[in-house]
Amino acid sequence: MSTSTTAGPGRRGILRRSGARGPGRATTRLASAGFTLIVGLAMAVLLIQMQGFEPFSTLAAGVQYAVGDPTSIARTIAWGLPLYVAAIGVAIAFRSGMFNIGAEGQIYAGAMASALAGAYLGPMFTGAHLALCILAAAAAGAGLAGALGWLRAAWGVDEVLSTLLSNYIVILFCAYLATGPLRDPSRQSGTTREVVDTARFAEILPRTGLTGVVFLVVALCALGWWLSEKSVIGYRWRMTGESPAFADAAGIDVKGSRIASMVASGALCGIAGAVLVTASQGRFWTEIGSGIGWDAVLVALIGRARPVATLVWVTIYCVMRAAARGVEQVSTVPSELSLILISAIIIAAAARAGVFGQFAAFRHRFLRTKGR
Amino acid sequence: MSEPLTNAGRPLLKLAGITKTFGPITANEDVTFDLEPGEIHALVGENGAGKTTLMRVLYGMYQPDAGTIHVDGEQVEFRKPSDSIRYGIGMVHQHFMLVPTFTVAENITLGAEPGRAGLFDRKAADEAIRKPMSRLGVDLAPNTITGTLNVATQQKIEITKVLYRGARIIILDEPTAVLTPQETDELFVLLRKLADDGSSIIFISHKLREVFAVADRITVLRDGRTVSTSATAATDPKQVVAAMTGRGDVNLGRVHRDAAVADVVLRAEGISTAKHRHDAALDGVSFTVRSGEIVGIAGVEGNGQSVLAEALIGTVPLTAGTVNLGGREITGLGVADRRTLGLSYVPEDRHLEGIPINGSVLEGLSAGRLRSRRSWRSWGRAFPKAMRAWGSELIERYSIKTPGYDARCSTLSGGNQQKIVIARELEENPSCLILAQPTRGVDLGAIDFLYGRIAEATARGCAVLLISADLDEILRLSDRVLVMYRGRVAAEARTSETSREQLGMHMMGAKVTETAA
């Protein structure tokens, strides 16, 4: 019997190293993060050296720009707020085995919905107007992702494909709206009308871009963590993601869990879009997402869909981006190089986090074409 | 059975002081094993006792950390399987290594094809496999497609393959797991014939009845060490079990139960399904299970038993027929509703369906309690203190050996994993329990424990449907037994009025009697 019962760990499920709570794992993860950062640092030194600058002082200037004083910290965080929400959203879907790579599209849908609610409703009491904008965004994202989740649950339409393709449909449709019927006639480029003032978060630290939305973001991250890791709902979602056959045989509503987790994921991504509109941009324009949805997917993968790890990685990512902007200012190291650097670091992190194994699992899923 | 071989000079094969560790785990420690020419030597032990590791060391798949291997008195070192093949060692794996779409000749010669320049010389191959085939009494056209043959014949092809490669030492890993009792007997005749012709056979098994039927000597491993080696004639099953488990009180006979059989709890009428994965479709299956009763479902794997279990719990839809539980029709209901109405289920594939293999013990135990919690309470904490205390209490009560409720299920042994499943299912206090292969890959001590819990459940009035490929299990536990063949109930009998041989006949579909439910 001995050979037959040794099934490989997690033949199904995307994030197979889940449910780990043993001691020693935290240190492994820290070591892994440390490795990644060292690789990144070495790469940075090399790239800056190649441009003929003194690497360490240049880097120090970048780090100074990112986290050197309270103002810069606030600025760095403010830039990252939508990413925190979107990354938590993506992680929640991953945890229940739904590979929601449609985050970018859901962010656009949410941004559009909140921009419209902000521009065409009101002015009214600020709190109510903001709530309306955020709810509209959540509804748009949730509806979009939920529909794709339903397709997967009911018809076996693979969500990897459907969410990926939905990005193009949604982003291009929003671009059509912003350049066509809903275009702000007073502007040249493709934007919608500016939201009224009651649909904007007030800055809490002057000239940092850090607004009151930070409280909402903290609350949403806490909610996402609770939902996914602590609640009964999260238990069902995680079981559905890790061991779908077990969940099915145990009487857990697998289809319902898949749809519900996609709804939650889409709602959070939609809210990330609303954060972009109501806390910084003030309107929808055709490039508003600037790849935050893709960043969210990457960060959630590196964080292996654990909410806390994902949030930590979002923070690291934000600091890196800000530092790269800082480096760009003090040297002629172009921003393209900082993007290369970030990509390399992500690859190193991904290698450590077993992301490639996860991609192999996806490929396997496609080759077998067995929609469960 | 033949006379024990204790004389002879130098053994054909001698493993001495074999030690193999995997990280902190010692799989083999100072293991000694030898094999005489013309001998059938059984290697027995529980799961994880180190049988497979030892054989993989012998077959060159693992390198031992310490110890020596002698073949014909010559010390050898096997770095890969081809090394050991060169010394005449052949392995018949539990899972056949045959290409179903290849012909018999292609499969047998695969990896050592006659002919030159990469071309397959059909004639030479047909010629070359003739001799080993006739040694086994296999009479098949060499161009038969392997996939069309039945399991027992495929197994013979596997053995032919080993003989074709010139093996003098044949390792058989759990060869009877896939066979009916009759096919098992045939295999034993064949093995005896091979041994009489001078081949030596290492027979790995945990089924004692078979070991005693075929082996000349028995070596018992426990926890990676050799516990005993004795001639079959000089020992008995009780001693061997004691050596395997380290306990003297393991029951091997019929499980004692005091349960009064009462009203019908589960009634299946004419249920049919579509074909599902590798299993046969159900075709009008009808039966009842009464309160306090254990009904066994016997049959060669792939005759619809797995589908039956899944159709009853609700993961496979019916195409016809009805299922009643306690007088209530549950045909159209989902798994959750069926479970709420008192149905419990121990699935066949423990790692996929029984437990969340990468989840924690507590997550595996609590599925029944968390499944049905509704509405706003689902937003609450899944594992508050009370739940964790409940989990710890279950771990205690079902003596699940684990560092704690938050240990990963995958780190537990098969027996302890199965205890998680049984604990969860029995804690729901079911009126009907479906057991699918409940003791597969479970060690003898844990089997004893699980049977005890099942007997207690029937004493409380639980109706049990026991689906098992292990006839001994069915004969030890059940009151009635149904035999499935090609998706139908081929026979039904009271356990006290039937025999292993009779059931075996029905399992092969030899004689289809009138079905009565």
PLM regions with names:
Chain B
Residues 2-517:
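Glycine-rich phosphate-binding loops of nucleotide-dependent enzymes
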